[in-house]
Amino acid sequence: MRIAASVEYAGQDFSGWQKQPKIKTIQGEIEKAIFSITNENIDTTAAGRTDAGVHALGQIIHFDTDLTRPMNSWVKGINSFLPHSIRIKWAHEVSPDFHARFSAKRREYQYLLLNQSINSAIMSH
């Protein structure tokens, strides 16, 4: 079964999306959380990769598993093992030919650059 999920994260504490040995990444944390509820090493594929410190509101991922459980159990289970700065927002079973990167119909990026002499209290990350 192939599962697609939407991931939201605050990336300031991570070295980007892509997993790397001995470095804290978003993908690495998600795959560790999936392992915690499945006891299987499951690889995830994302619609795109973000750099260190970058946040995401709706990064789409997919992964394959033979385990069957309600979709809300995937969401709650994975979230229970993730740091608070990473959240799975939803999960859906998708067709086997769905691909998070290649099936995307559009991508949206927003850049916020503060050009001021005083640091922002709410934009400090």
Question: Each PLM stretch: what is its role?
Answer:
Residues 1-125:
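Structured-RNA-binding interfaces characteristic of tRNA pseudouridine synthases
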